[in-house]
């Protein structure tokens, strides 16, 4: 074929970029370079791009070709080029005559899927190239005197040119990695793919010279543009620690995974953002805890029209009406000191307690009734039995009844030195037919909130902020006050707005502040590997020299929210809650931090690694462009990992990846948190309960959940599936949140509902798969939002097995 080639170059090849290369080694990213070969005679090599799955070259090569010529472009990992498989990452084969007419001339942009070699190694991703017959413009590679190593691929790679498919449409080229979001990786070693068993790595004889990392003046895309063109004004493109591209809107200081469209309209975006914020605000304000459900909740004004208060009657219909409307028996005589009666715009009376700055529908002068929730024949919680306190008989030995300053009855158990709202003379709704975890959590909550350290001190703590500057203003206000001042009655005021804080303003304050301070825009937190709404500490937060002060501030805010019984609209990875409780992290916790690393460390534990993995007790970490080797134990870089000590190695890697990298930031966070919440008190909760304590329990729409669920091995009409949804509907909000934690790893629901549920690899709908023996418990895969549900024969069996699985689970990783 060579004799038919022209004597001078007649085609210019530009190797632009590769996108989504296969990460064959979980312990590090590849160093990709491309080798272009025509007919086995002409060979050109790009420079090496360090540590990326999305290399961008944009390098030109002039070739001599005819219509029958086959252009083969292979991608290799430079670190593995001398191994048996040469670090092969994929190949494309293009017959020149199929894509361009050499006589007529032209310019073609091609995007081709990378193909496997004869070794059948797993590959994926795309390669973007350009072919042009226009050679009049200077070749920038040659103009800069770049020397290319001519590499003849070794036969050991088993590459046989194949004619590729027809040209695809151009795709978006990948972006260069932002130095501020560098990916720290473990010590470079060969780790098998999970899709195949590992084979012993034998050194392969690499023909030709190994490519050098020759850096010329290549055209790199700036962070304000990508392959689709320049971003709108004020927008920036970045990559997170997992190589995922996201976009920063500096106009509004927000981040998004979605590229702003070319017809970007700021007003439209603002309207959509405000609509989403309103949805999140409503969801946030509806969150509560078990203890809050049994007492009289303070009304949020203004309220929709309600029926006028009516005296309670003995009939169950009136009792149900009372539960629905909150109507109570009107009192007589003077109101207690500090109380005031007001009326809503709809004419409904409510009562203001100026002593505690709270509101309630309940007339403090009315006879105190004790309410008990029960179940009717249909199993729904609708029946309320009421009995006056005077008709219940004497209290058990060691118990005492007291009144709060708002005339609410509570009970003191001197035997255990605890207090509770529950009357011990009534059958407790916490004792019969209620899961153990619910009894525990609610009682823990009662105990926790009754402790002297959690009591609000006399006086007021005034915090004045501007809505459009809430992060900076809150930082200045909260950090200037002492911890004891922050324990006084919290009074929030928004600049330029009139209003007294009777609870609504502080709820709005914590909602807005949690959206700001956990925003990845500030580089303090980043989205986890699990999805794009759970958070973890950014190990590169040091880009902000004041980051430790900010973490102390955030710790204070989280403690402040718990102390004043408010919720934050933010959710963290499971390991973060365990760290707050000073619990040891485990390999299961790695799943939410780095799914690939979790999978490969699990493989390491389960398989023989002798002669397969060349690991040492050291990791490589890269921070702000500086690469350093960190020993996991003294002299670790010289200690090989064997079958005997691999368990210790996995533990040390897990601790380094989750805890050690962010130790400074986390300690600063906890120093602020413990100023308001003592460590010995918060330790009564487990990590799942701590998530609910900080974020509250959401009102879950089961219809929306069911609508956006996929099934594998089942159909929606199957009895097992029908029984599953029947069980979910009978559970209360707390149990549903527990189920959501069990199956997805968090109780957080996306703002647009279950249709936007995310997994570790992007959008991932909730899935129920037929799997397991009917005697086994259900199993969950939190990174994939999947529940493995055995084919249980009866409703009772399914309900029992589901309850045990949800109640007895320890930690967030289920597999």
Swiss-Prot record:
> Which ranges carry the WW domain?
229-262, 333-366, 393-426
| Keyword Transport part of the UniProt annotation | no
Source organism (scientific name): Aspergillus clavatus (strain ATCC 1007 / CBS 513.65 / DSM 816 / NCTC 3887 / NRRL 1 / QM 1276 / 107)
MF annotations from Gene Ontology: phosphatidylinositol binding; ubiquitin binding; ubiquitin-protein transferase activity; ubiquitin-ubiquitin ligase activity
Region described as Disordered: 134-237, 253-353
Biased region (Basic and acidic residues) positions are 279-294
Q: How does it assemble?
A: Interacts with creD.
**What's an example GO cellular component term for this entry?**
endosome membrane
Q: Where is the signal peptide?
A: none
Q: What class of enzyme is it?
A: transferase
Identification of the protein by name: Probable E3 ubiquitin-protein ligase hulA
Q: Catalytic residues?
A: 783
Top-level taxon of origin? Eukaryota
């Amino acid at each position: 074929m060579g004799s038919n080639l022209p004597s001078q170059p007649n085609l210019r090849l530009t190797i632009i970029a590769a996108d989504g290369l296969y990460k064959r080694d979980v312990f590090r990213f590849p160093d990709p370079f491309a080798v272009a070969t025509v007919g086995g005679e002409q060979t050109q090599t790009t420079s090496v791009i360090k540590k990326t799955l999305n290399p961008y070259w944009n390098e030109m090569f002039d070739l001599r070709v005819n219509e029958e010529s086959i252009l083969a472009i292979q991608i290799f990992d430079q670190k593995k080029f001398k191994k048996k498989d040469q670090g092969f990452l994929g190949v494309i084969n293009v017959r020149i005559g199929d894509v361009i007419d050499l006589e007529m001339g032209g310019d073609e942009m091609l995007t081709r899927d990378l193909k496997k070699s004869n070794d059948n190694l797993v590959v994926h991703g795309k390669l973007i190239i350009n072919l042009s017959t226009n050679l009049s413009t200077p070749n920038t590679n040659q103009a800069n005197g770049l020397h290319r190593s001519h590499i003849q691929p070794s036969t050991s790679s088993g590459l046989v040119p194949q004619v590729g498919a027809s040209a695809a449409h151009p795709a978006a080229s990948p972006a260069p990695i932002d130095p501020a979001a560098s990916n720290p990786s473990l010590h470079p070693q060969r780790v098998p793919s999970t899709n195949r068993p590992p084979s012993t790595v034998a050194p392969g004889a690499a023909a030709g010279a190994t490519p050098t990392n020759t850096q010329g003046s290549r055209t790199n895309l700036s962070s304000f543009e990508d392959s689709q063109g320049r971003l709108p004004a004020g927008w920036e493109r970045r990559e997170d620690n997992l190589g995922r591209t996201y976009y920063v809107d500096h106009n509004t200081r927000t981040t998004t995974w979605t590229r702003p469209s070319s017809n970007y309209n700021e007003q439209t975006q603002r309207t959509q953002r405000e609509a989403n914020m309103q949805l999140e605000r409503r969801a946030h304000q509806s969150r509560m805890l078990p203890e809050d459900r049994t007492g009289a909740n303070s009304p949020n004004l203004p309220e929709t029209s309600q029926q006028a208060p009516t005296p309670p009657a003995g009939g169950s219909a009136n009792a149900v009406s009372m539960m629905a409307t909150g109507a109570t028996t009107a009192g007589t005589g003077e109101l207690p000191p500090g109380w005031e009666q007001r009326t809503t715009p709809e004419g409904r009376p409510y009562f203001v307690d100026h002593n505690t700055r709270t509101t309630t529908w309940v007339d403090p002068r009315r006879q105190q009734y004790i309410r008990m929730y029960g179940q009717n024949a249909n199993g729904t919680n609708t029946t309320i039995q009421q009995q006056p306190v005077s008709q219940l008989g004497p209290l058990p030995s060691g118990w005492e009844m007291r009144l709060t300053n708002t005339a609410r009855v509570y009970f003191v158990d001197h035997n255990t030195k605890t207090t509770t709202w529950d009357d011990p003379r009534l059958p407790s709704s916490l004792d019969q037919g209620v899961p153990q975890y619910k009894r525990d959590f609610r009682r823990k909550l009662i105990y926790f909130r009754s402790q002297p350290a959690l009591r609000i001190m006399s006086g007021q703590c005034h915090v004045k902020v501007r809505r459009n500057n809430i992060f900076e203003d809150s930082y200045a206000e909260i950090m200037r006050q002492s911890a004891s001042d922050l324990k006084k009655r919290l009074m929030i005021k928004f600049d330029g707005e009139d209003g007294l804080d009777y609870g609504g303003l502080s709820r709005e304050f914590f909602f807005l502040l949690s959206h700001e301070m956990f925003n990845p825009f500030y580089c303090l937190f980043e989205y986890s590997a699990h999805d794009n709404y759970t958070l973890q500490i950014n190990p590169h937060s040091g880009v902000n020299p004041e980051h430790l002060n900010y973490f102390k501030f955030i710790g204070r805010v989280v403690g402040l929210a718990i102390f004043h019984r408010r919720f934050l609209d933010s959710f963290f990875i499971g390991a973060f809650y365990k760290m707050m409780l000073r619990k040891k992290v485990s390999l299961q916790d790695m799943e939410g931090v780095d799914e690939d690393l979790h999978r490969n460390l699990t493989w390491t534990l389960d398989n023989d690694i002798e002669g397969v993995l060349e690991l040492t007790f050291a990791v490589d970490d890269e921070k702000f462009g500086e690469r350093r080797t960190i020993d996991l134990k003294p002299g670790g870089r010289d200690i090989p990992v064997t079958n005997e000590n691999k368990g210790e190695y996995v533990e040390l890697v897990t601790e380094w990846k989750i805890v050690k990298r962010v130790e400074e930031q986390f300690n600063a966070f906890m120093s602020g948190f413990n100023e308001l919440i003592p460590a010995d008190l918060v330790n009564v909760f487990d990590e799942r309960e701590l998530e609910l304590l900080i974020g509250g329990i959401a009102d879950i729409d089961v219809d929306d959940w069911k609508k956006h669920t996929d099934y594998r091995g089942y159909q929606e009409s199957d009895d097992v599936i029908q029984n599953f949804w029947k069980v979910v509907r009978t559970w209360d909000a707390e149990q549903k949140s527990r189920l959501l934690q069990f199956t997805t790893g968090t109780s957080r629901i996306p703002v647009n509902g279950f249709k936007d549920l995310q997994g570790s690899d992007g959008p991932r709908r909730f899935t129920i798969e037929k799997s397991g023996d009917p005697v086994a418990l259900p199993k969950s895969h939190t990174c994939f939002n999947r529940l493995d549900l055995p084919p249980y024969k009866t409703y009772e069996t399914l309900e029992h097995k589901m309850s045990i699985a949800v109640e007895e689970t320890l930690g967030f990783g289920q597999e």
